[in-house]
């Protein structure tokens, strides 16, 4: 039986993607897909910063909860907002970070999109850092808000935009997922107060790795009570597929009934909430892992900077700036051939000629591996067939 043919307007678009995203590369695959790593390679592609994904206590709690589960909650979380239905992990996460309220979501993407859809009216001014996560941009678009991008971490530019357009919502990441830079959170709080703006901080890449007991950068800086909203993907340090919204107001009462991602997606299941509870307990007592991760990240940042590479990172995320796609392909292949595997960030995550190979460190990385990465990058700098920006 013949398969149905796609209409030309779809087929032409797919042909364009295949030609420009796949066929153009040497291996015939997308640029993010390089060689297959071996067990001896240094793999820095995961966001599991405290190396908890295979923790035996978390696995045991998930298995036990799943085996004991008797409920059938395959429904929207909108129907489960009575106090007796809500998972205890929400109160524990609120206490952990110092916020009044926490609401679980199916992902960090859903948390950001749903929150902005809830709090924005059409034409609300959303002042968004140029490098903020795409889910924050999409949330503003969902709400028909007016997005005003400001230059990365440039508070003077932000002030100028607010003076021009009026109050709105300031939207930033605490740690940026491509370059590993840290937002000037204290100054952003001051700006939000000065101009009557709300402030939303996505702590996806700092929750668990920074702050007292891993409570995040806002907690570390004593700013929790000064910020209106915090969000996070729990698919980073928490090593699970979930997200959350924190607030110091009543917005989380409304999100489950206004946010399309909340209404039209099924709730997290009880065994998943139980797994998150155990993960939180481990994160709270993981100071040794956090300290080791910080030491390894500092050592690698210093070592790469001494090679003359442009390293803007202030965290465990380190971006090697590799320019255009053909050069990025060469750098990727060289690193992988020498046992170092990072994540390629290219269009649409970056602009076409500003690609990045991201090295995401975790607490299992050791001194010998850091030395190896620096050695491979040193050889790469002198190789001559490609360049670093």
UniProtKB/Swiss-Prot annotation:
The record's keywords, sorted A to Z, are: Acyltransferase, Aminotransferase, Pyridoxal phosphate, Transferase
InterPro entries, A to Z? Aminotransferase_I/II_large, AON_synthase_class-II, PyrdxlP-dep_Trfase, PyrdxlP-dep_Trfase_major, PyrdxlP-dep_Trfase_small
Q: Name one GO biological process term.
A: biotin biosynthetic process
Q: Which Pfam family, any one of them, does this sequence belong to?
A: Aminotran_1_2
Sites of N6-(pyridoxal phosphate)lysine modification:
236
**Which SUPFAM superfamilies does this entry report, sorted A to Z?**
PLP-dependent transferases (SSF53383)
EC assignment: the record states: 2.3.-.-
Family to which this protein belongs:
Belongs to the class-II pyridoxal-phosphate-dependent aminotransferase family.
State the name under which the record lists this protein.
CAI-1 autoinducer synthase
Which gene name does the record give? cqsA
């Amino acid at each position: 039986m013949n398969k149905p043919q796609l209409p030309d307007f779809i087929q032409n678009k797919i042909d364009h993607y295949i030609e420009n995203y796949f066929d153009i590369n040497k291996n015939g695959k997308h640029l993010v897909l390089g060689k297959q790593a071996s067990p001896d390679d240094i793999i820095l592609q995961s966001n599991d910063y405290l190396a908890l994904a295979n923790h035996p206590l978390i696995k045991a709690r998930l298995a036990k909860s799943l085996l004991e589960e008797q409920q059938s909650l395959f429904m929207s979380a909108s129907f489960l907002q009575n106090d007796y239905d809500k998972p205890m992990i929400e109160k524990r996460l609120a206490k952990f970070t110092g916020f009044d309220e926490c609401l679980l979501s199916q992902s960090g993407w859903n948390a950001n999109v749903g929150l902005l859809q809830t709090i924005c009216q059409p034409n609300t001014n959303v002042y968004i850092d140029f490098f903020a996560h795409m889910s924050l941009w999409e949330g503003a678009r969902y709400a028909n808000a007016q997005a005003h991008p400001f230059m990365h971490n440039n508070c003077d530019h932000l002030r100028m935009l607010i003076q021009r357009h009026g109050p709105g919502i300031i939207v930033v990441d605490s740690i940026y997922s491509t370059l590993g830079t840290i937002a000037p959170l204290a100054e952003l709080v001051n700006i939000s107060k000065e101009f009557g703006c709300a402030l939303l901080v996505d702590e996806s890449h700092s929750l668990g790795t920074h702050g007292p007991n891993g409570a995040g950068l806002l907690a570390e800086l004593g700013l929790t009570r000064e910020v209106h909203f915090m969000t996070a993907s729990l698919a980073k340090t928490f090593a699970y597929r979930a997200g959350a919204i924190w607030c110091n107001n009543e917005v989380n009462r409304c999100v489950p009934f206004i946010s399309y991602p909340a209404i039209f997606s099924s709730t997290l299941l009880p065994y998943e909430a139980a797994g998150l509870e155990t993960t939180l307990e481990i994160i709270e007592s993981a100071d040794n892992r956090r300290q080791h991760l910080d030491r390894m990240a500092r050592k690698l940042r210093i070592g790469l900077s001494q090679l003359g590479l442009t390293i803007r990172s202030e965290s465990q995320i380190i971006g090697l700036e590799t320019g255009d796609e053909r050069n990025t392909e060469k750098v990727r292949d060289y690193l992988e051939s020498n046992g170092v595997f990072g994540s390629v960030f290219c269009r649409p995550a970056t602009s076409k000629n500003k690609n990045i190979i991201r090295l995401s460190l975790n607490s299992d990385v050791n001194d010998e591996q850091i030395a190896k990465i620096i050695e491979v990058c040193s050889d790469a700098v002198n190789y001559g067939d490609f360049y670093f920006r």
